[in-house]
Amino acid sequence: FQYAMAGLAELHPTAMKKNDFWSWRESMYALALKVQPEHIEAIAAMLYKEMLRHGYTHVAEFHYIHRDLNVSSYENKAELSERIARAAQSVGINLTIIPIYYEQGGFGLPPQKEQRRFLSSSFEDYLELNAAVKTMATKYENCEVGFGIHSMRGVALDNIIEMAKHRTGNS
C-alpha cells in the first residue's frame, strides 16, 4: 500500500508543516486507516506492472494491513493477502507474501491507535492469519508464504523466540 503514498510524505523545505525523519509515518498511517481491499489490489497491480516493466520477476511483499476499517478480522482472514496474490497473478509476477506480525508500539509500549489495522491480538492470532494465507496461496500459481515480524520494537522478545521455534518445528 505504501506505493500509493509516493510523494505524500515529501515536503518542500519551506513548507509550514514540520518535516523530520518520522513525519512520513503520519502520511502512511493516514493512508493505512483508509485503504480498502479493492484499493490494495489496484495499488499492488500498479506496482507489480511497473516492477515487471523494469525486469523484476519476483516480489517479496511484507504485508502489514490485516484488519478492516473497524479493526476486526475480515471474514476471510486472508482477504487482503488474497487481493495482493490476485494482483500478482493478474500481471504475471511471482510472489512471496510475508504477513507481518506486529503487537506493540515500541519496547514494552502499547500500540498506537494508528497502528490498529496492523496488529495481531496474540501470537496464536498471527499463526491463524499465516495459516489462512498459506491456504489461500494454494489457489494461485507462483505464490509462496513466509513469516515475518515488524521489528524488535514491534514484537516482544518472547514472541520472537516463539516465532523462531515455530519456524524450525521446535515449538
Task: State where each predicted segment sits.
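Metal-coordinating catalytic core of metallo-dependent amide/deamination hydrolases
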Residues: 67-171
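Histidine-centered catalytic micro-motifs
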Residues: 1-6, 171
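Generic, ordered loop/turn and secondary-structure boundary motif
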Residues: 2, 22-25, 102
